[in-house]
Amino acid sequence: DCDGQMNLTRFYLPEFDPAVNYSMASLLMGDGEPVWEDNLVPLEPGLNLIPGSPDLYNLDLDAIKDGVSAPENVRNFVDCVREDDGADFFIFDCPPGFTTASVGALMAADEVVIPMLVDGFSFAGTQDMAQQISNLRRANQGVRIAGVLITQWHNSDVVRQGEQLLRSMGVPVFQQTIRRTDKVPE
């Protein structure tokens, strides 16, 4: 969980206390456990989590203040896991901005899925993200956009037109969408 808001962590681990447990912030600061498996919280067989932490916000502030950032620690962690054949894939839940943790995730990623609500701000954000991923290829030549995943889709003219516009932008778009439902916020 690369987001200081910790929604993914709170969903899976409502009682998680980042003050006494390792987190993505620990990993980025180089304070994680030396054995990669000890940084994971097992959720189910084959599903593990490196929890988020509000310390991720402090990490970004420290990086600005001190000019020190360690996003390569995420790539080093992923490389260690891959060397041991310890995971089939990684999913990094990132905030909608370029934080230290999200840059670390992008440096370690092979493919990026961009979830997108069809609205004007999201089109600009998707274009910005595509450009940033292109720029990031200097540090990670293998990263590419797997596709944009349209979220909160519903059958309306505005959404259908937005979807057509998105498909004309030259960014891959998944055929599958995530429908809008009132049940999720409840």
Q: PLM features: residue spans?
A:
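P-loop NTP-binding core
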Residues: 1-186
